[in-house]
């Protein structure tokens, strides 16, 4: 697995340092730089708190949660819907049962469910995906999970498509522009390197994800929200794209110490202006929203302690 070299800045290892790893996603998504941004700020003050942070590129949300549960990751970035399902033992986590030791740390950027199609494919709305070659994402990724939820709501299955490929997020833009697929899906913060690649390497369009099935998902699930991808963000897409989405969240478990999580949260929140500049998807973040939006597992004790120390109001559900 890839580790961000910039996160392991050469410095003497202090006896007693605690090493922690954050699981992220594919290197072209926003989870990887999200983990890197967190680690950069944490490692800046490691001489005072003794926590050293590295980033691992992984298969995404579901993988991160399962690996935290297995005790092989300390923290991970995960979509808000998969945080909910893991804590409650529903959907993909029904067989494993409720992960009651899962803990929320904070939420990060909104993640619209994004459908990109080749301009010559004739795909202009959700229904047009029928009978086309669509990349539904690799098993274990958040986008694959969300695509399956959407397909279920629409009464679709893999046979709805001429081809349902299972490429990783880092592979799908090239496949689209090489005409191996007609459309790809990605649950991602914007602007995204992967979507930029797809819209600059070939003529491709963002597709509105709307209709009764989508309205029902948003109405019946607190972790979904309507979302808009601004027009003009990507080449050849001057108009707003309307869809639904989740949010990126940082999660851990009760197995990770209060000191470690307190140090990580403090590193981000006390360098907040710097954090917001580390990726365009962070530009509009607000501390008050980050400690509540999309969090369904209880707050980790280390996070809750920091928020109380600085006077940030925690919702009763998260104590």
Place the predicted regions along the sequence by residue.
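Ligand-binding clefts/hinges and TM-proximal coupling segments of bilobed small-molecule sensing domains
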Residues: 132-149, 223-284, 289-292
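Bilobed "Venus flytrap"/periplasmic-binding protein-like clamshell domains
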Residues: 19-45, 107, 111-178, 273, ...
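An extracytoplasmic/periplasmic, membrane-proximal ligand-sensing/linker region
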Residues: 171, 178-179, 188-206, 216-219, ...
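Extracytoplasmic
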Residues: 17, 48-50, 60-63, 70, ...
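Short beta-strand-centered segments that line the small-molecule binding cleft or hinge
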Residues: 84-90, 101-107
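N-terminal (or domain-start) structured segment
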Residues: 14-85
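Pocket-lining segment of extracytoplasmic ligand-binding domains
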Residues: 80-82, 91-95, 121, 158-256
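Sec/Tat signal peptide C-region and signal peptidase I cleavage site
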Residues: 7-15
